[in-house]
Curated annotation (Swiss-Prot):
<dbReference type="InterPro" id="IPR004364">
    <property type="entry name" value="Aa-tRNA-synt_II"/>
</dbReference>
<feature type="binding site">
    <location>
        <begin position="233"/>
        <end position="235"/>
    </location>
    <ligand>
        <name>ATP</name>
    </ligand>
</feature>
<keyword id="KW-0067">ATP-binding</keyword>
<dbReference type="Pfam" id="PF01336">
    <property type="entry name" value="tRNA_anti-codon"/>
</dbReference>
<comment type="function">
    <text>Aspartyl-tRNA synthetase with relaxed tRNA specificity since it is able to aspartylate not only its cognate tRNA(Asp) but also tRNA(Asn). Reaction proceeds in two steps: L-aspartate is first activated by ATP to form Asp-AMP and then transferred to the acceptor end of tRNA(Asp/Asn).</text>
</comment>
<protein>
    <recommendedName>
        <fullName>Aspartate--tRNA(Asp/Asn) ligase</fullName>
        <ecNumber>6.1.1.23</ecNumber>
    </recommendedName>
</protein>
<dbReference type="InterPro" id="IPR002312">
    <property type="entry name" value="Asp/Asn-tRNA-synth_IIb"/>
</dbReference>
<dbReference type="InterPro" id="IPR004115">
    <property type="entry name" value="GAD-like_sf"/>
</dbReference>
<dbReference type="GO" id="GO:0005737">
    <property type="term" value="C:cytoplasm"/>
</dbReference>
<dbReference type="GO" id="GO:0050560">
    <property type="term" value="F:aspartate-tRNA(Asn) ligase activity"/>
</dbReference>
<dbReference type="Pfam" id="PF02938">
    <property type="entry name" value="GAD"/>
</dbReference>
<dbReference type="InterPro" id="IPR047090">
    <property type="entry name" value="AspRS_core"/>
</dbReference>
<dbReference type="InterPro" id="IPR045864">
    <property type="entry name" value="aa-tRNA-synth_II/BPL/LPL"/>
</dbReference>
<keyword id="KW-0030">Aminoacyl-tRNA synthetase</keyword>
<feature type="binding site">
    <location>
        <position position="233"/>
    </location>
    <ligand>
        <name>L-aspartate</name>
    </ligand>
</feature>
<comment type="similarity">
    <text>Belongs to the class-II aminoacyl-tRNA synthetase family. Type 1 subfamily.</text>
</comment>
<dbReference type="InterPro" id="IPR047089">
    <property type="entry name" value="Asp-tRNA-ligase_1_N"/>
</dbReference>
Amino acid sequence: MNYYKTHTCNELRKNDVEKEVTLSGWMYRKRDHGNLIFVDLRDFYGITQLVFNNDKDFFCKISDLKPESVITVTGIVKARTEDTINISISTGEIEVTVNNLQIESEVEFHHNEETAKEERSILASIADDQEYPENMRFKYRFLDLRREKVRNNIVLRSQIIAELRKFMIEQGFLEIQTPILTASSPEGARDYLVPSRLNPGKFYALPQAPQIFKQLLMISGFDKYFQIAPCFRDEDARADRSPGEFYQLDLEMSFVTQEDVFQVIESTLYKVFAKFSRKSVDKGFSRITYKEAMLKYGSDKPDLRNPLLISDVTEIFRDSEFNIFKSNIERGMVVRAIPAPKTAEEPRSFFDKKIEHTQKEFGAKGLGYITFNKDGTAKGPIAKFLDDNRLNHIREATNIKPGDSVFFASDKENEAATIAGKVRTLLGSELGLIDNNIFKFCWVVDFPYFVYDDKSKKIDFFHNPFSMPHGGLKDLEEKNPLDILAYQYDLVCNGIELSSGAIRNNKLDIMYKAFATAGYNKEEVNKKFGALVRAFRFGVPPHGGIAPGIDRIVMLLADAPNIREITCFPMNQQGEDVLMDAPSKVDNKHLRELSLKVVE
């Protein structure tokens, strides 16, 4: 028998009346009625109401005890009267009359009055379920986690990870841990470096992903690998990205095609989303090429809940009387159109605000609009420069109806696509077109293998350098590098990228040629990826994988506004752990041991 409890605070029911029980937990709420004090005792599992009578010698103790103190009580279960039943809690038909009280740990406020005031405020937020500034919540995260909503997110996270692990094992995957201290990798973000005491002047790197290790596992003969992998990238925070570290369901398989990877992920994620969400889950995982995604949605992370589709109307404006767009087109730019249903009768301020917002927030230029009124006429700053034939072509291209409007964005192709995508998202949200009660997945496939970097003035890898190009070595030798596609794919849900993956290159000559195209010679490749190069000389199976982000999956299923809400001990947006005061300075002795010196 447990010394501290016979039951949890969510366990007692009406059929337990007159039983003697022992409960332990935190004093959640206290109500003093003079001769009686009612206490809501809370543990991890729930709440039970306690009744303290003033004829007990510990009555004064409970009267003076501060909320969130930890107590153990023994008492008799009693049925509540009909008018005092609390249907909002599962133990609401009973209460426990306390015969014995033991104070396990009493709340003590800091001696500094300013700090004590802060502590009282955060304690009050637990009882009242108030929101407090994020930094205060994170500084007192051990208190913040006592709030039901916050705790439930962490419980949900644990349950989702357990379910993912179960599905992987059921499909024959082996869970294998790969090293945390490793070498720096070219994943695209900055590494977190760890100085080596035993090797002065040398550094480990925390893994941005287990990319090379999981490929080495396939070369080693393992067939299906997975792990709940911690990944570390020195990146700025966003709503869907934590600074520093994140977790992913990392997996890799041998002798597979792209379709085999899709089948595993679609089956797994559909089951997880269907189990843990009240929203409907679209069973169809759409396939969209990268080129199509950028054209129709203005993003490689398309939100398919938004029905608006972007159209290319460059040819309609070519040689038109609207000189701004005409001039842009002559200089190699494009024009994209974004429909705005049922907005033709909106005042001019509606359109001006959208354009002003897009210019201010996204640095957009070359914006305009046309309204197509119900009587068939077209109005707006651009309409007067277009003849009826061009206006009809715009109607057809954008599939709009009388009473709709169209926004336009003109710029270089990539910039115009991005701005059009931002406008599409803005309109979808403000016009109430997005269904918030559904999860819609899509695969974005056929990414470019290479991209031209305007800053470095050179060709570089668009995504993962270890993926297989379409057409293999032949395309690398014969095609324009910017026309080569890769067997790379992203999984997107409701406009959030859940995962990236690829079918890997398994041939050494293709690896060397791909890196040569991006400006790396053999010596550089051998030095940077020595382990992989050595392994590639000893039989490499065709293999591929993917790594869905755990944090983003949980964020979506918890309907949380950002990743910090589903992380147990998160950093703030400045990459600071205000609870543990990290990052922090270290003393000179420690620095000397690591052969380091801080340069101010």
